[in-house]
Amino acid sequence: MTTAAELRAESARLLAAKGGNSQGLVPTMGALHSGHAALARTAVAENDVVVATIFVNPLQFGDAVDLDRYPRTLDADMALLDAEGVDLVFAPSVDEVYPGGQPLVRVTSGPLGEKWEGASRPGHFDGALTVVAKLLHYGLPGGAAADGTTAAYRAYFGQKDAQQLALVKRMVSDLNFPVEIIPVPIVRSEDGLALSSRNRFLSDAERDAALVLSRALRLIESRANAHEPLHLDSAVALVESQPLVELDYFDVVDPATLEPLAENCKETPFRGEGLAIIAAKVGAVRLIDNAPLFS
């Protein structure tokens, strides 16, 4: 489907036909991989009707070259979603999502969106939140639940994009969107690399080099699990020892606010909860990763 009107009508029809009580939404930009399959699989297991969206959002790309380079693999994406049992796929045009050109009114990410990825990619999260807000509206259940009440509505996001996930949760809370945000854990290859649509652009040597990101995260994670000081500087040194990797940031933050934990939390035995976050360029490819910390 390519129009919001079609999506609304078909989701209402399906919800009624199935006697369903819930609808799930899986927003994507396409170029799907096993991580997206996990999102779809989780949504299908938890909802009566599942909608996936495929839309490469121009508002969140600061570089037109990066936008043009982003892979478009619609046929393969549709096959993956069908295999996971997704009911409806919404793949709108840019004109459908932004009729008349770029929107004059947008969702702004505020201070939470200006740090980390936001500092490296100014305006990225304003564009991302604007399209997520629209997709959440498009994906609203088109009809009532079988028992006549409002159908439950859930949207599924990967934990790899930790800052985006935190911002979407905050937007939904602050603006009273009638949807529950469900985080889905990071999916990794057997050697530990977090799955990403951008991994296809890595050479063999760059892919090997990129493994240092997950190794550094595992080092911090093992120290947290053992209630040891995190000694972040040694993990940073590990990443910086790889010549093909240019580190942007590596820190341990509060999972909700993304504020860095106090320095004494990193140099004394770790207690509590945190999130280790990392971003780096490997060759020309920017990669992000993270690891939840508990003790």
From Swiss-Prot:
For this protein, the record's InterPro entries field holds:
Pantoate_ligase, Pantoate_ligase_C, Rossmann-like_a/b/a_fold
Write out the residues that bind (R)-pantoate: 60, 164
- An example Pfam family from this entry, by short name, is Pantoate_ligase
> What keywords tag this UniProt record?
ATP-binding, Cytoplasm, Ligase, Nucleotide-binding, Pantothenate biosynthesis
The reaction(s) catalysed by this protein are: (R)-pantoate + beta-alanine + ATP = (R)-pantothenate + AMP + diphosphate + H(+)
Pathway it acts in? Cofactor biosynthesis; (R)-pantothenate biosynthesis; (R)-pantothenate from (R)-pantoate and beta-alanine: step 1/1
Extract the GO molecular function terms from the UniProt entry.
ATP binding; pantoate-beta-alanine ligase activity
| Active site positions | 36 (proton donor)
Which GO cellular component terms are attached?
A: cytosol
The enzyme's E.C. designation: 6.3.2.1
Q: What's the domain of life for this entry?
A: Bacteria
Which residue positions does the secretion signal occupy? none
Subcellular location(s) per record:
Cytoplasm
Residues that bind ATP = 29-36, 158-161, 187, 195-198
Listed GO biological process terms: pantothenate biosynthetic process
Look at the named UniProt entry and state the broad enzyme category this protein falls under: ligase
UniProt keyword Cytoplasm, yes or no: yes
A further note on this protein reads: The reaction proceeds by a bi uni uni bi ping pong mechanism.
Q: What does this protein do?
A: Catalyzes the condensation of pantoate with beta-alanine in an ATP-dependent reaction via a pantoyl-adenylate intermediate.
The family assignment reads:
Belongs to the pantothenate synthetase family.
Report quaternary structure and partners: Homodimer.
**PANTHER family assigned:** CYTIDYLATE KINASE/PANTOATE-BETA-ALANINE LIGASE, PANTOATE--BETA-ALANINE LIGASE
**Name of the featured protein:** Pantothenate synthetase
Q: What is the lineage of its organism?
A: Bacteria, Bacillati, Actinomycetota, Actinomycetes, Micrococcales
